[in-house]
Amino acid sequence: MTAWPTINMAATGQNITRLMKQYGMTVRDVQSAFGFSNPQAVYKWKRGQSMPTIDNLVILASMFGVKIDDIIVVEATDVASLIA
């Protein structure tokens, strides 16, 4: 069976939460850094309900001094299970 990589959004959100805590950043700090008018996007990232765009992942990685691969969690998904 072929396995395709997929992003585990919940685990990625946990990484974002961990990095924010590690660097002493609040949701409001991240919201302000991105210039968002409200914090909902950041809360959704943390809960794994949505993913930052590629551009925003690059910014997050730069803010935290890590690689994008240190933020996103990629897992293999069995292709057969996707089309069954």
Residue ranges and their predicted role:
Residues 1-25, 33:
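A short, Lys/Arg-rich alpha-helix, primarily the initiator
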Residues 17, 28, 58:
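Residues within the helices of the helix-turn-helix
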Residues 24-44:
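Short alpha-helical DNA-recognition segment
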Residues 45-46, 56, 75:
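DNA major-groove recognition helix of helix-turn-helix
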Residues 55-70:
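DNA major-groove recognition helix of helix-turn-helix/homeodomain DNA-binding modules
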Residues 70-84:
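Short amphipathic recognition helices of helix-turn-helix/homeodomain-type DNA-binding modules
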